[in-house]
């Protein structure tokens, strides 16, 4: 069985939660719980409420995601 590709979509940070997790409102209006990817964490990139980000979502569970990029 081949692994399903993840869905990439843009969103805006609504709220910062403990353990480097965030509530993100996606372009389609869905609100997901997202954590920070390792590369962003490694380079100490700050993510604040109101920032525009790119989120990867698994097709198996669309309520959780991973933040992969913060737009400038």
UniProtKB/Swiss-Prot annotation:
GO terms for cellular component: cytosol. PROSITE patterns: S1_IF1_TYPE (PS50832). One of the essential components for the initiation of protein synthesis. Stabilizes the binding of IF-2 and IF-3 on the 30S subunit to which N-formylmethionyl-tRNA(fMet) subsequently binds. Helps modulate mRNA selection, yielding the 30S pre-initiation complex (PIC). Upon addition of the 50S ribosomal subunit IF-1, IF-2 and IF-3 are released leaving the mature 70S translation initiation complex. Belongs to the IF-1 family. SUPFAM superfamilies: Nucleic acid-binding proteins. The keyword Iron-sulfur does not apply. The lineage of its organism: Bacteria, Pseudomonadati, Chlorobiota, Chlorobiia, Chlorobiales. Keywords: Cytoplasm, Initiation factor, Protein biosynthesis, RNA-binding, rRNA-binding. Component of the 30S ribosomal translation pre-initiation complex which assembles on the 30S ribosome in the order IF-2 and IF-3, IF-1 and N-formylmethionyl-tRNA(fMet); mRNA recruitment can occur at any time during PIC assembly. InterPro entries: NA-bd_OB-fold, RNA-binding_domain_S1_IF1, S1_domain, TIF_IF1. It comes from the Bacteria. GO terms for molecular function: ribosome binding; rRNA binding; translation initiation factor activity. SMART domains: S1. The keyword Protein biosynthesis applies. HAMAP family: IF_1. This is Translation initiation factor IF-1. It comes from Chlorobium phaeovibrioides (strain DSM 265 / 1930). Residues 1-72 form the S1-like domain.
């Amino acid at each position: 069985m081949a692994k399903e590709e993840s869905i990439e979509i843009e969103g805006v940070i609504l709220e910062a939660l403990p353990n480097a997790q965030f509530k993100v409102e996606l372009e389609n209006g869905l609100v997901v719980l997202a954590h920070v990817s390792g590369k962003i964490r490694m380079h100490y990139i700050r993510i604040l409420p109101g920032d525009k980000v790119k989120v990867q979502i698994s097709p198996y569970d669309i309520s959780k995601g991973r933040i992969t990029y913060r737009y400038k």
